[in-house]
Regions:
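A general structural motif
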Residues: 52-57, 78-84, 127-137
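Residue-level signal for inorganic ion chemistry
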Residues: 33, 64, 99, 203, ...
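Generic structural signal for buried aliphatic residues
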Residues: 1-2, 7, 98, 243, ...
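Flexible glycine/proline-rich
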Residues: 115-254
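Short glycine-rich anion-binding loops that position phosphate/pyrophosphate groups of nucleotides
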Residues: 38-39, 103-106, 154
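A generic local secondary-structure boundary/capping motif
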Residues: 3-4, 19-25, 88-89, 127, ...
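Short, glycine/charged-enriched hinge/interface segments at domain edges or termini
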Residues: 1-73, 213, 218
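N-terminal small/polar loop signature for handling phosphorylated ligands or for N-terminal nucleophile
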Residues: 61-119
Length: 254
């Protein structure tokens, strides 16, 4: 078994057949998920005017577990600076990675960057990525606690995309896990890029006479249904004008 191999039933059986009782493994990161917003209500509640169900806590928690990381805590927090800072400070003490969805933009209630920078003693090194969706992303590191800090967009599809593109990728790099090879497919339509931004385009795959076709899944980054409908994504380079119908592209799976 090579370094970076995830131990599943077949791998465990192979080790047993060889009489190997113990093997060195990577300790999973401990992760805390915090979703911020006064508008968030529990998923078993009926949202009132100006309210939405708390999607990100559940979706991100599921993705954390799928990645093989240890979910320590997950909860929604109101847009109250003192309360949010208290929750983040508690999480930093116990976790290797903190994910905060929402509050990463530039509005009056968007206080995540300021709090993270204060807690980590100027540890925030990025506020804003040339990525669509995902522009308001915050990245930081607490040197004292050795904790990664991630401020994700509040929109569900954008939050999941940023987690996948940055933190799942980083975990695989640290542990030596090989990337899943992309699929080759042909675009079903012309699509313009976003000048100055790398675009993460959600697509669904369908079989055609000439091979796999990639059909864009259109929808706003706040619609989690777009992520559920997609089979993967195509990356459009920031210097690329766009994609043409029939153009061959690489489709990466989640």
């Amino acid at each position: 078994l090579k370094a970076g191999t995830r131990i599943g039933p077949a791998q465990a059986g192979t080790l047993a057949a060889l009489g190997v009782v113990q093997v060195p493994v990577f300790k999973p990161w401990k992760v805390a998920v915090l979703s911020t917003g006064d508008e968030l209500v529990r998923i078993d509640q009926v949202p009132g005017p100006g309210q939405v169900r708390d999607i990100n806590t559940w979706a991100l928690s599921c993705y954390v577990k799928k990645t093989g990381l240890e979910l320590v805590s997950a909860e929604a927090v109101k847009d109250e600076e003192v309360l949010l800072e208290e929750k983040i400070r508690e999480a930093v003490k116990a976790c290797d990675l903190i994910l905060i969805s929402g509050g990463s933009s530039q509005g009056k209630k968007d206080m995540t960057m300021e709090i993270l920078n204060r807690i980590s003693k100027e540890g925030v090194f990025t506020h804003g990525l040339a990525l669509k969706p995902g522009k308001p992303t915050i990245l930081g590191y607490d040197k004292e606690k050795h904790t990664l800090l991630g401020g994700l967009p509040g929109h569900p599809a954008a939050a999941l995309a940023v987690f996948h593109l940055l933190f799942v990728w980083l975990w695989k790099q640290v542990t030596g896990q090989p990337d899943q090879p992309p699929l080759e497919a042909f675009m079903t339509t012309n699509l313009a890029g976003a000048p100055g931004k790398t675009t993460c385009l959600l697509v669904k795959l369908q079989m055609a006479p000439q091979g796999l076709e990639a059909e864009p899944v259109f929808g706003k980054s706040g619609l989690i249904s777009t992520m559920a409908e997609a089979d993967g994504y195509v990356l459009i380079d920031m210097n690329q004008e766009g994609l043409k119908k029939g153009e061959q592209v690489k489709v990466y799976r989640f």
